[in-house]
């Protein structure tokens, strides 16, 4: 089965043992356990092969609701050495309350990677109006359309009077872009739902 991020991964049966992720070894050796595969890899390549920390462990902590997950996710979002899709996913996995989440989100709106900026815009969807507008108004003029429309979508539930006159033209333009993108995909139910939400909000 193809991965959503299109990557080809080095098998890590040790991670299967730790957090239950699939691995290519047991795809063929289905009658064997993940521990057997991890032991074989250690026997062939040495016990230290690919034992470094993996971002999958951070996501596993978050999904299990572990207390230390917030700090681990924040570090992952801030790690520019990680792929943008991983950092954006970490941002989406963070709870939206708490000082760690707040500082991580505002930093992410200024990130060099558009995928991370778009995820930051999405993360503000339920934030208080003033906080949301302060963080997302600059993204309405982002050079990347995906970021602009993510910001417009998150701001669309604000009351008309909550968007100041200086921001209104950029908001209207970005929201029009979002509607145009949905109109391209009207053969898909999701586009109709997205438009319905925006029209209800505005």
Roles of regions detected by a PLM:
Residues 22-33, 136-160:
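Short, solvent-exposed linear motifs at loop/edge-of-secondary-structure regions
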Residues 78-83, 109-115, 140-146, 184-186:
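Short coil turns that connect the paired helices of HEAT/ARM alpha-solenoid repeats
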Residues 1-84, 92, 143:
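Primarily the internal scaffold of c-type cytochrome electron-transfer domains
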Residues 6, 23-26, 71, 88, ...:
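Feature representing long, continuous alpha-helical segments
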Residues 83, 144, 150, 165-202:
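C-terminal luminal/periplasmic domains and tails of membrane-associated envelope-modifying transferases
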Residues 2-8, 38-46, 89-90, 105-107, ...:
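Composition- and surface-driven signal marking solvent-exposed, interaction-prone regions
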Residues 54-65, 85-99, 107, 115-129, ...:
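Structural detector for internal amphipathic alpha-helices that build alpha-solenoid repeat scaffolds
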Residues 67-78, 98-110, 128-140, 161-179:
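Amphipathic alpha-helical scaffolding segments comprising HEAT/armadillo-like alpha-solenoid repeats
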């Amino acid at each position: 089965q193809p991965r959503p991020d299109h990557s080809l991964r080095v098998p890590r049966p040790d991670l299967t043992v730790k957090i239950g992720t699939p691995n290519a070894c047991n795809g063929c050796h289905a009658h064997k356990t993940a521990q057997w595969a991890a032991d074989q890899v250690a026997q062939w390549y040495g016990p230290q092969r690919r034992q470094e920390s993996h971002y999958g462990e951070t996501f596993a902590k978050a999904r299990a609701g572990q207390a230390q997950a917030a700090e681990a996710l924040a570090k992952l979002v801030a790690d520019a050495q990680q792929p943008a899709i991983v950092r954006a996913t970490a941002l989406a996995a963070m709870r939206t309350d708490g000082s760690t989440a707040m500082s991580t989100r505002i930093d992410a709106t200024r990130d060099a990677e558009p995928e991370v900026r778009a995820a930051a815009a999405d993360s503000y969807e339920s934030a208080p109006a003033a906080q949301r507008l302060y963080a997302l108004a600059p993204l309405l003029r982002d050079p990347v359309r995906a970021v602009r429309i993510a910001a417009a979508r998150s701001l669309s539930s604000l009351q008309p009077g909550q968007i100041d006159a200086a921001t209104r033209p950029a908001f209207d333009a970005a929201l029009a872009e979002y509607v145009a993108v949905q109109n391209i995909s009207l053969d898909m139910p999701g586009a109709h739902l997205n438009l319905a939400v925006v029209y209800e909000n505005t």
